[in-house]
Amino acid sequence: AAALTMARAGLDVMMVERGKFCGSKNSSGGRLYGHSLEKLIPNFAAEAPIERKITQERLSLMTEGGALSFQYGSDKLENLKYPSYSVLRSKFDKWLADKAEEAGVMLTEGFLVDELVVEDGKVIGVMTGGEEFDADVVILADGVNSLLAQQIGMKKELEQKDVAVGVKEVIELGEDVI
């Protein structure tokens, strides 16, 4: 979204993606709030790879010994002007990157940003594949365990007690089943 916005503003934008394609390194799905993306790409839901419209809300409060859940469903959730959707990030991110490319973003896939180029305390570019690329603006999007943010002191290294390993399985069900 940031690359697309900057390209539309007339800036030269290079997006560096570590994976084979944007989204290939994502292993999760998520919830996409339509009001934000609608501003960026009007009528996005007609073409974006969304899974389902969110029509129910559930909040669970969990303790070591149990859980208490609240569920809310309403016609209002089904008829919102800007509904929210479930998405698989690997599909959605690729679609959004394609939109950015259409707007003029130069996308380089299969490259890892090895380090940030810093001069006089300011980030002035990135090193990737042995080459240096100068930049007026660098936006880090390398995930929760950002080694680049650690390099410049923006965040501390995560401690083992602060992370967990998750397992995900995608089960495809037809609309008639859900």
Task: Tell me the role of every PLM-derived stretch.
Residues A1-A2, F21, N145:
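Conserved Rossmann-like nucleotide-cofactor binding loop
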Residues A3-L4, Q150:
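Short, hydrophobic alpha-helix immediately C-terminal to the catalytic nucleophile
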Residues T5, A9-L11, R18-G65:
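N-terminal FAD cofactor-binding segment of flavoenzymes
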Residues A9, S90, W95, K99-I178:
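Predominantly flavin-linked oxidoreductase catalytic cores and closely associated redox partners
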Residues K25, G29, S84, L88, ...:
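Catalytic cores of large soluble enzymes that bind and process phosphate-bearing ligands
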Residues G65-S69, G130-E132:
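Short, mixed charged/polar active-site loops
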Residues A67-R89, G125:
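Helix-loop-beta segment of a Rossmann-like dinucleotide-binding subdomain
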